[in-house]
Amino acid sequence: MASSTGLTVAGALLAGDFRLPAVSSLIPRKTSSSLSCLSNRDLSSPYNCCWRLSRGKILTSLSNSRKFAVGKEAEDGFLSNVSEDTDEMFDDLFNKYGKVVFRSTDVKSPTAEVDDDAESLAFAVELAKVASDVKAGDIKVLFVKPLVYWTRFFIIATAFSRPQIDAIGSRMRDLAEKKYGKVANGDVKPNSWTLLDFGDVVIHLFLPPQRTFYNLEDFYGNAMQIELPFEDQSQPRN
């Protein structure tokens, strides 16, 4: 996130903002603040609860400033009241502004977000086609952006041997690097669960027992499944 933030009332957010598919539950994010967001938790990315500073950071910041007190006794006396003063300050802000959110300086417009989603979707579908060409089974592309903050799409597919996983991964890496200039992070050698992370698209390649055991489709059950344009996908072998 960019370091500079600006406060704005949630009700004054851009009208007509791109709305993602509604979900019944979201994976919670851990925040460092002693205060929690208000009851409405459906603030779309990149908006998050504004109270991100921990009390420890507030105390450290204030104690390092010489504008407030001079000398050890004055500083100690000041710090003893910081906790109470900080809580009162936050209470006053909530009473005055209600639901407050922050925007980073690099927030994209709704149109730009839609364009990025479309580009990522095209990339994901092309990678899924690679898996299909190498005879992977039960290929699914899930739009997980509303559920996680670190990627837009999952590709989940079943392979039936480690050499097949290696072949799928190699062809995906080649396509991504040559056509899109992207290099994957993640597993280099094929595993029973092999992960390739291209940033906006994350691929999960499973052997059948691990696909059944981890059942990512159920774990991310609120994600929208993308209809793939190619047909005749291989089915998992018994």
UniProtKB/Swiss-Prot annotation:
InterPro entries: Iojap/RsfS/C7orf30, NT_sf
Keywords: Chloroplast, Plastid, Transit peptide
Recorded GO CC terms: chloroplast; chloroplast nucleoid; plastid-encoded plastid RNA polymerase complex
Subcellular location as annotated: Plastid, Chloroplast
Main localization of the protein described in the UniProt heading: plastid
Residue interval of the organelle targeting sequence: 1-66
The protein's role, per its UniProt record: May be a ribosome silencing factor (Potential). Involved in plastid biogenesis.
Family per record: Belongs to the Iojap/RsfS family.
Subunit organization: Interacts with chloroplast ribosomal protein uL14c (rpl14).
PANTHER family: IOJAP SUPERFAMILY ORTHOLOG (PTHR21043), PROTEIN IOJAP, CHLOROPLASTIC (PTHR21043:SF2)
Listed HAMAP family: Iojap_RsfS
Protein name, as recorded: Protein Iojap, chloroplastic
